[in-house]
Amino acid sequence: MSLINLAFKKVKTEKRPALLTYTVAGDSTKKKSLEILKSIAKYADICEIGFPHNTPIADGGQIQSSAYRALKNGIKIKDVFSIVKNFKKSKQSKPVILMGYYNMIYQYGDNNFINICKKVGVDGLIVVDLPYPENKEFAKKCKKKDISFIQLVSPTTSLDRMKKIIRDSHDMVYYISMLSTTGGKLKVSPKKILERYGKIKKLNKNKNIVIGFGITEKTIASLRKADGLVVGSALCKEISNSIKKRQNPVTNVTNIVLKLRKKIS
């Protein structure tokens, strides 16, 4: 069983959703971003790590600021791999899902990129701009190396398309809860999100389905019926605030992750 599936199995026995954190590799520095990962892993179940990108189409202002800081610090794709490798070596490591855009993979070539991911210990991949069914070949290549390719579904995904995506998905499916960039205010009520979520879940009760976009300390408890919840913008915002106030982002971000974990435990 994959580490991602094991993480979901563990939280089910604890009768709570998995907490997935998202941070940008290299924010605020390469060293600090590794320290943040090691620290938040005490309370997170799965760690999503974003490739900093100069035009991240799906990312809201907070994540764009994080990506900008990382790029300004000269972070390269090889540095992202090095952060993952060092994190996976640590005692408190958790399953890692890398999230990015296809042009970065294209520079390396699919097979080369997937081989490096395997070597450094990546458990899953989300490629934001490689939708289904165009991603089928790439997903197959990932599966061959025991890397989970994570499909995305949204409120506008048709039922027929949704069925196919869920059928072909690997360890989990990422449900984008609302049509906006990440970190937007929750324009849809948690009740409505869970209604839609329930319809997706009915298609395959055994599939792990996580909710992302708009999840904060205020909204997380009301969504705890989901298999997993992804929090990213709130963490990136805390890194920005810590830098502005000249405080240690490691401590501040960890405190937020601990609070989030308590709200769903």
From Swiss-Prot:
Pathway entry: Amino-acid biosynthesis; L-tryptophan biosynthesis; L-tryptophan from chorismate: step 5/5
GO MF annotations in UniProt: tryptophan synthase activity
UniProt keyword list: Amino-acid biosynthesis, Aromatic amino acid biosynthesis, Lyase, Tryptophan biosynthesis
Its EC number(s): 4.2.1.20
Main EC class the enzyme belongs to: lyase
Active site residues according to the UniProt entry: 48 (proton acceptor), 59 (proton acceptor)
The protein's name in its UniProt record: Tryptophan synthase alpha chain
Species for this entry: Pelagibacter ubique (strain HTCC1062)
